[in-house]
């Protein structure tokens, strides 16, 4: 199955450089520096506990600690949100005010901000954005385009294959 193949590929080839390379977005055609497992983890095809256990059976924690930390952070934020259901309800029930014109420009990749517009296209075609790109995207969405974060979160959840309320 594809998830097992991708997991094995990352454990054998990508994990050793993960800590040094994970923060760089080399574009949609070059994702060897990240695990590419988030879509499987988000949909429970791969379980976090089993993944960490398998990795630690092959590597010392010292060699893979950054990846293990990232998995633990994901589990932490899932638990945090589960214990605060009102946060999710408030998000779902929110009805923020915004400029419909600016919103349409943003979701169509027509803002005039080249990197942002490229990321919109990448999100819609690849259904993925690098973690750091997601942060830059959100910053531009809120502070440059003055759009409510709730709309950006909904936009992400609509397109991201690995969309996760606690992690995005």
Model-derived features with residue positions:
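Structured secondary-structure scaffolds
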Residues: 1-165
